Amino acid sequence: MIRAALLLVLAAVGCATVLPGPRVDASVAPSPAQRWIPPQPLPASRPPEPDPALVAQIKPGMQVTLQQLLAYALSNNPQTRSAWLNARAAAAGATSRRSAYYPSVELDVQAGYTHQSFAKGALTFDQWALTPSAQLTWLLLDLGGRSADVEEADRLLQAANLNHGAAIQDLLLLVEQGYFQYQGAKALLTAAQASVKEAQTAYQAAEERRRAGVATIADVLQAKTQLSQAVLAQQQAEGNVATVRGALATSLGVSATLPVDVADLPERLDVQPLGETVDKLIERAESQRPDLARARAQALAVASRADSISSRGLPKLVLGANASRSYYLDEPWVHGDNYSAAVTLQIPIFNGFKDTSDLLQARELAKAARADTETLEQQVILQVWTSYQAVKTAEKRVGSAQDLLAAAQQSSEVAQGRYKAGVGSILDLLTAQSALANARAQDVQARANWLLAIASLAHDTGTLGPPAGEARP
């Protein structure tokens, strides 16, 4: 027997020295200068399919309203879906923590064979047995550990739900920003097209005057330059419209290639002054911002974790019970029963300062979480202040831009009439047309910026919500 064991050990040692070690060359790139190529192409995820209800709205001449876009995005965007699923997972985790208050019951079935020999084999004993058993373990008292764990799980669930609310508000702002930016881009394109037409009119007028001998080739070239610049601006505006439209479609959770169309930017806005002071808006944000409430819940969860760790060093009272029956298969109808029950008092003494270190770590993390919450509170105040000032500025710019546009239109009309009458220069006409193009752009940007500022302020104060009474498109 000893010789056989020695031979087995020597064989194992020999295999260890002969067998090759682990090789990694085939699993990584050949060199630092070459990229790794997977042996098989990774499966590509399918692009999201737009909902038929939304596709029905995407037809030539049909425009989707902001309420329809918001309702569709809420039900289709993967970011809000991910936040909702995380909240459901947190709810399951909270339920799991409560299981510590219930007893644990386990059922085992053991089948075995026993051979014993005595007096150098003169007496032997062989037996087959089948033994089912049941064990019960129940933590009766732990002086706060389970309650702290449940409190932590509840706070994490609260934070997950608030994170879902923050994701909804972020999505609503993203869609509204895309919607208003799309409207603004379309309005800028319309303004650029009008500038091209006016530049063409000026170019034709310069050509006619040159043929009549009352204008020079320099006038024609200046008008041609103005026309080329207007065409370039129009082409840039067309590209911006396509880009912003793709961003809006992406915010809905569909492909950027979906040809979404929306209504034009309103020519006149009912600009109403803000009815609340910035202090009131900040107070509202501090009480309604879901991301701020989420940070507070996470800080409380970390504090509960510290309470749970501190309870590890306290005594625990555990109830244990066991019942089993052994059936001896070589002797039918013969069995043996075992029953036991005990209440155990567990008192931790020493574990290498692990609990002390874990508690210190948890308490420092709790302090850091509170500091992060304070930082976020300051950021929220700054965001509300910035959005408030943006709205106030946008209110003024809307009126000023309209006055600028009206004056520029009159100036352009006068300059065009004077040039055709032969009493004005081409430079005066081109200058007036350039000022008109700039005034159109300023007017469009002022209107779009006011709408964007209102949406941002609603988001920053935590009051931006889904449309009421709107069905999915």
Walk through the language-model features, giving the residues of each:
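Periplasmic alpha-helical coiled-coil/stalk elements that build and connect Gram-negative outer-membrane
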Residues: A16, L162, A166-R284, S387-A390, ...
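Terminal intrinsically disordered/low-complexity segments used for targeting and assembly
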Residues: M1-Y72, E238-R284, A458-P473
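C-terminal structured "cap/appendage" subdomains that terminate the fold
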Residues: R418-A421, T431-A437, V444
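A small-residue-enriched
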Residues: A16-W36, A71-L141, L173, R245, ...
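Sec/SRP-type N-terminal targeting helices
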Residues: R81-S82, R98-S99, L140-I168, A218, ...
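A short glycine-centered flexible hinge/capping loop motif at secondary-structure junctions
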Residues: R210-V214, Y419-V423, D460
